[in-house]
Amino acid sequence: MAARYWDKLQDLSQKYKDYVIQNPTGATQLESAVRMLSYLIAGRFADSHELSELVYSASNLLALLNDGILRKELLAPPPTEGSRRRLLTWLGVLESLEVFIEIGAARAWGDRTRWAAILIIQLLKACLRIVLLFWYRAGIQSSPPVTPLDREGILNQAEDNSNSGSSCFVGRRSSRAVRSLDDSASSHRRFWRSPQIHDGKQRNTGETESDKDGSELGTLGTLAEAIHILRPITHLLSLATWGQKSWKPWMVAAALDITSISLLSDVRNLSHRERAELRRRMFLLLYYLLRSPFYNHYTETRLLLLLRLLGDYVPGVGLVARPLMDYLPVWQKIYFYNWG
């Protein structure tokens, strides 16, 4: 009985993989539909926030699953990438579920369990990132850890690889390319559209550079990245020591982030992905204006006044400003929205 259900499950899994490979656009539309559903659910009924976050997490996991299927089938990463890719995938799963786990733990078991769940998640993430940094030489680690695929570019590249010089015929008058029967791919690898003829230039799918080993950071660069990785743990420990209303945890976290960014800015020969991640971290320093206790003492009254003025005097802005004003207190109570 169990073997029969297992066979059915494997058959269903294979059918879904074939569907994603043959219809990546349809898979993308499915992910967007699930994500849109999470927005529609929010605020509709009691416990809608938890359900909305669950659906949103499911959409992120679905995108991660579909990217993994396409990456394995169409890009064929080398076997040596397997263990590193699994660590990145688990890191992506944790980041996709962290908000739902936090609010679910708070709802089911209370605030102490919520903080325990937050600490466990941050410890797991830090351990995975430390292994990637020191064992796999991952360099500056980006967020999200698994770079989303350029699916259209990968499909076109897969077609380019399958369309060698003798694999298709190009009509002289119509310039239309037609595959030969001998060189047609198997049914689950076949793309049901006309082959494209290119000038031989390699397409950039967004995968090549981001999947390479990180740049050589050197001693100071590695120390700076380790500071960035351990900053959430340090912040949680300082919260436990001085309390949530103290300025000390806020200042310690800000000092660690600024120190890490300053040291990493001096590292040369960073890849394009690493430079983009460094710019993202610089921009995220603005989040400290929205983090307590700075938010409670300075930002809250000014931000609410600005949103109220925009909502009252700028046509159409109120549709966004008023729900945002209502949501800000909820957003402030969720740790991973602020400090994740």
Curated annotation (Swiss-Prot):
It is a multi-pass membrane protein. Involved in peroxisome biogenesis. Residues 196-216 are annotated as: Disordered. Its main location: membrane. GO terms for biological process: peroxisome organization. GO terms for cellular component: peroxisomal membrane. InterPro entries: Pex16 (IPR013919). It is found in: Peroxisome membrane. This is Peroxisomal membrane protein PEX16. It comes from Xenopus tropicalis. It comes from the Eukaryota. Belongs to the peroxin-16 family. Residues 196-215 have a biased composition (Basic and acidic residues). Residues 71-86 are annotated as: Required for peroxisomal location. Residues 1-89, 137-340 are cytoplasmic. Residues 111-114 are peroxisomal.
